Amino acid sequence: GGVMLMKRHDTVSECVICFFFLFSSFTQTVEHGFPNQPSALAYDPKLQLMAIGTKSGAIKIYGAPGVEMTGLHKDTAAVTQIHFLYGQGRILSLLDDNTIHLWEIVQRENRSHLVEVHSFNLPGKPGIESTSATRVTVMLLKLSCELLALGTEGGGVLLFVKSFTCLVIPLFSVPEEYKCGKSLGPVESLQEHPQDSDKILIGYSRGLVVLWDLNCRHVDNLFLGKQQLESLVWERSGNSFVSSHSDGGYMVWAVSSSNPCTHDPISSTIPYGPFPCKAVNKILWRTTESGLLFSGGMPRASYGDRHCLTILQDSSHVTLDFTSRVIDFFTIHCTDREKEFDDPSALVVLLEEELVVIDLQMAGWPTVPAPYLAPLHSSAVTCSCHISNVPPKLWERVVSNWPICGGKNLAADPKQKELLLTGHEDGTVRFWDASGVSLKPLYKLSTANIFQTDCEHNDSLTQAGEEEWPPFRKVGCFDPYSDDPRLAIQKISVCKYSGKLVVAGTAGQVIVLVLSDEKSDHMIDVATVDLLQDREGFTWKGHDRLPPKSGSVVFAPGFQPVVLVQCMPPAAVTAVTLHAEWNLIAFGTSHGFGLFDYHRRKSFAFFHRCTLHPNDSLAMEGPLSRVKSLKKSLRQSFRRIRKSRVSGKKRVVVQEANAQLAEHDAEVTPVQRRIEPRSADDSLSGVVRCLCFADTFLRDGTHHGPTMWAGTNSGSVYAYALDVPSQEKFSEQSVEALLGKEIQLMHRAPVVSIAVLDGRGNPLPEPYEVSRDLAKAPDMQGSHSVLIVSEEQFKVFMLPKVSAKTKFKLTAHEGCRVRKVALSNFTSVSSEEYSENALVCLTNLGDIHVFSVPALRPQVHYDCIRKEDISGIASCLFTKTGQGFYLISPSEYERFSLSARVITEPLCRVDVERPHDLSAHR
């Protein structure tokens, strides 16, 4: 017996090793979305690469779509400035701990990576008085990369040449009132002369500006500004420069060798005066015939809270009004010194919550949609849904040149198109192209327009009137304030073959939408379903339903709503599923579930069931209610009333599904800790956690047909046999549902997922896949089984008898719970023809387990998300090809792959020519 046992053990081990090598490997592949808390921006016009630094110490480089690289400083200090060494593929970063770091783009395995190669500690840590004078406020890297100039808080300028040898600029021939070092204030700006690289402009906080000759080491010109300085910029000829100030104004200064000491500027303007204005933090002067760009400067009293950037060109004047703070901006323009004008083509603005690009060549200066860095959180993400292998027909129905185009994307075109759908707090669903490294926005669907909400958007608010001053123009899409939290999307289900979509929200709204290429003006049918039926003694204390608009509504081409199913009470929808071939949707809340035939919506073909336990008083409070809990006595009186009512009714015989697997203590393996049964008194036991449709054997072993399955928070599973009329009779007959089985898991753990497997143990194909020859027909000869996943264990039951076949308890760790599961298909690395299905599971500890199906053998196990990252775990989503996404911040998805074959990661190259003498830059 011992030998046999060993052999079996070896076989299992071999199975696991085989799976690991052929199918599985865990890789965190790419971060999609917008970096959390950006703090610095740089652009290399030669390589056409953009770099963003963040408060957590990350540096991210972006070029053409697909060209992305990320580096992370060892210490999590904020990146305060970043500068490219022009054309060299190197970056200098300054952190707020007063350290400077040199990064290099290096080639490894024929692709580019960003690597830190050197770091340099400057004297002076923050918060220590004696050294705060040496704290760096501004950096200038000369275009030739031969010299680095650092301005400090104490007013000093340090020059670093080869090997970081330090020189200090002495302040000779400065007027008496500026002589005392501290009274100059910190260095605010250092700018290289655009025509003579041996000269730099030094701007001090108190207003003094010095033109310094680096070769002769003396002052060429002094400009005696009296207003507190914020920023300096040269005009490209070098004959003049502009200074911007804390009073909201800017000044133009002439540079003349015949006048070494200039007291007054040529002109001085406060564009948004005369009342006190906020500082102009940064200004750019770009010549076409004329052109200025600056951030800030708003009238303090009336618009002091606005985040603005102004574009001035002759008589054209636009105040770009953003919803988050301007971090930095640059223009893409001609850098050839010989040319007369800058002729900027685009303005790139990094904001705290998004990246906005303005086309400066087109009339009206429109925004350019970005192919990456999408602000996923323009309204908070509330749910998500992934569609792999999107058919071309759907793709073509839901899909401008991007100016930042450095590097080469080496990744082959993806073999199949993938869509990521995100539901948001404002009632929108956004469609993203998730086929490659860049998560690209494709389409936005809004559901708010079918309801009467308190805050109807007024167009007059978004566009400035002709007479309005300043001439504001709302730009960007970050809008964190939802008009009505009830609009938030909770669940999404989509049929990629028929172009049908179901979205469900926070106030019990379930909306069926159909993809249309034509504009439409129609009324939406509304069907109301009372999930409490005739239950007495329950009063909903939560929010009201969203009132639908009366009359017809105009809908643009795209997904258009055809019917609104309103659950009553209007609690958040907790589960939804769609079967487009049968014209059915199923939906669930904390009170029950319903089945709806949307094809026969005129006669409202409904079936519904209440899942409320007699003592589910908490389910009546609603997520937006202020009521936290009911007094115990009230709950007990509810229980007494309900017990007397329920006990008198005849009930379907509940199968104790665990009875056949009633285990003895001796059989409990160390990995599978004993599960404690839960009491039916646990709050919210009636919440419907999952729903599924399947064509399988429920009534007997010879006749298969449509079924619907529902699982609840208290470990109940309901299975219904459905009579679905044939296609020809859809209009005449309605669907009928008959309760076939009711299963109660003994440990009463919430049911996370239900899936029916065919005779070979494979998941059933999606609707339309078989009828359109897109998938093999399922095995209807062998006996089917149902996989039921609860928070504590997996079980496979044979159908139609619902006899237990196999199980696995995932509770080795105290408090370990299943959070997300999916059936994924893993294709072999060695052969595309060979693939295996597996059950992928994420726990509340953040680790991922992969199990064989239907045997439920553990295959591999990976640490993925920190267990403290509750929102990351809650947002995790698995794809059918073994990839996954989870939010690492409100604005970024981390993408990962469990498949050794299907990996979406940056594969790019940046070709650079560097001078041989690297010591000059080390």
Feature-to-residue mapping (PLM):
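Canonical WD40 repeat/beta-propeller blade segments in eukaryotic WD-repeat proteins
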Residues: 32-42, 77-84, 123-141, 177-193, ...
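Per-blade loop-tip surfaces of WD-repeat and WD-like beta-propellers in eukaryotic adaptors/scaffolds
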Residues: 17-27, 61-70, 102-126, 154-185, ...
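Intrinsically disordered terminal extensions that flank WD40 beta-propeller domains
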Residues: 1-35, 346-348
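Extended amphipathic alpha-helical scaffold segments
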Residues: 313-317, 321, 331-338, 342, ...
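Non-catalytic interaction/regulatory modules that flank or connect domains
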Residues: 268-377, 580, 591-592, 698, ...
